[in-house]
């Protein structure tokens, strides 16, 4: 399997499966002298780890990170940063009864089509658990970007068709669901309880806002900043759509409504989401990701086995009702990895 590395200069390569001994990665290209410790990475991992809140899986993982290389006396050395996270609460026997049956909405059938063999335990490499390594990588990128006065906020704006407002994005990391709207939380909780009682799952929408991005990042045509951000977020398994700025609403707007007018103080609006012609404008870079419902539901579903025989499946095991609260730190991490890479690309080009 290829495709396990993200980035051109600031690179993260990840490894591991949902029910294997552990997961981890190697970060190449991180400059020397960046303050970094296991505690700094752990803070971000704790925001993603399973077993928290009413929407999360019952699987309990401490997700304790161990830095293996590339850090000395609390600072990066400029060499490869290796890290590892153990799996401690996997229950592979939960999948033994469905090992030869394709789960609707999962990558079982496509992995078989490509490789002719697959790890049926929770999806193996295609599991959402793979994203723990991305968050560790994003934590390193965040420390690098902090030196550039660049910060990133990520927050939930919709769950199960119920919209919240962007009222307090700076407090989202303190609130349930990483909500930017405290008032919508009770409605989301009720919706999750309702759907859980039906044996079903929910999706939603996450917004990522990157502040302090200097003008000039991105390359025209095939290496645009917004194109790379969309690629980064779409690489997360549950994401099915990405918008930059006004996004799909721009298709229904007039040019006079969508254009961001300018005056002596700069831009008067930000429908472009901080990117024009694939290059950052100096405004906040705003991206939204549309996340599908978790496909592991306890309702009976029609499917086929590996031999093509029709059958019915009812998925047991431990699964999220809604992945949104745990995917927020993942999307934030992918955005930071992207911007960190572009900062270093810009430096290389002078």
UniProtKB/Swiss-Prot annotation:
One of its GO terms (biological process) is chorismate biosynthetic process. NADP(+) binds at residue 48. Its EC number is 4.2.3.5. FMN binds at residues 125-127, 277, 292-296, 318. Reduced FMN (FMNH(2)). Pathway: Metabolic intermediate biosynthesis; chorismate biosynthesis; chorismate from D-erythrose 4-phosphate and phosphoenolpyruvate: step 7/7. The keyword Lyase applies. One of its GO terms (cellular component) is cytosol. Keywords: Amino-acid biosynthesis, Aromatic amino acid biosynthesis, FAD, Flavoprotein, FMN, Lyase, NADP. The keyword Magnesium does not apply. It catalyses: 5-O-(1-carboxyvinyl)-3-phosphoshikimate = chorismate + phosphate. Homotetramer. HAMAP family: Chorismate_synth. This reaction introduces a second double bond into the aromatic ring system. Belongs to the chorismate synthase family. PANTHER family: CHORISMATE SYNTHASE (PTHR21085:SF0). This is Chorismate synthase. It comes from Maridesulfovibrio salexigens (strain ATCC 14822 / DSM 2638 / NCIMB 8403 / VKM B-1763) (Desulfovibrio salexigens). The gene is aroC.
């Amino acid at each position: 399997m290829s495709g396990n590395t993200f980035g051109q200069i600031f690179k993260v390569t990840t490894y591991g499966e949902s029910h294997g001994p552990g997961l981890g990665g190697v970060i190449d290209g991180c400059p020397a002298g960046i303050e970094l410790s296991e505690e700094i990475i752990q803070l971000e991992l704790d925001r993603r780890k399973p077993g928290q809140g009413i929407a999360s899986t019952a699987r309990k993982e401490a997700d304790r990170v161990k830095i293996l290389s590339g850090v000395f006396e609390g600072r990066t050395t400029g060499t490869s940063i290796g890290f590892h996270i153990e799996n401690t609460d996997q229950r592979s026997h939960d999948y033994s009864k469905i090992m030869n049956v394709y789960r609707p909405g999962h990558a079982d059938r496509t992995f078989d089509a490509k490789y002719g063999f697959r790890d049926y335990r929770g999806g193996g490499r295609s599991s959402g658990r793979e994203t723990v390594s991305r968050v560790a990588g994003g934590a390193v990128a965040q420390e690098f970007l902090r030196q550039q006065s660049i910060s990133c906020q990520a927050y939930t704006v919709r769950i199960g068709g119920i919209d919240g407002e962007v009222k307090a994005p700076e407090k989202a990391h303190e609130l349930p669901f990483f909500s930017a709207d405290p008032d919508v939380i009770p409605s989301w909780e009720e919706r999750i309880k309702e759907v859980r009682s039906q044996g079903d799952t929910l999706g939603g929408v996450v917004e990522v806002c990157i502040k302090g991005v200097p003008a000039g990042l991105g390359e025209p045509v095939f290496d645009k900043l917004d194109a790379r951000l969309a690629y980064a977020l779409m690489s997360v398994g549950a994401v099915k759509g990405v918008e930059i700025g006004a996004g799909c609403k721009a298709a229904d707007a007039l040019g006079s409504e969508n254009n961001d007018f300018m005056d002596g103080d700069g831009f008067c609006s930000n429908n472009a989401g901080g990117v024009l012609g694939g290059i950052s404008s100096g405004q906040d870079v705003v991206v939204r990701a549309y996340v599908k419902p978790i496909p592991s539901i306890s309702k009976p579903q029609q499917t086929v086995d590996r031999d093509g025989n029709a059958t019915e499946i009812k998925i047991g095991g431990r699964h999220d009702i809604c992945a949104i609260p745990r995917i927020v730190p993942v999307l934030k991490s992918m955005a930071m990895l992207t911007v960190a890479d572009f900062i270093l690309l810009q430096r290389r080009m002078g």
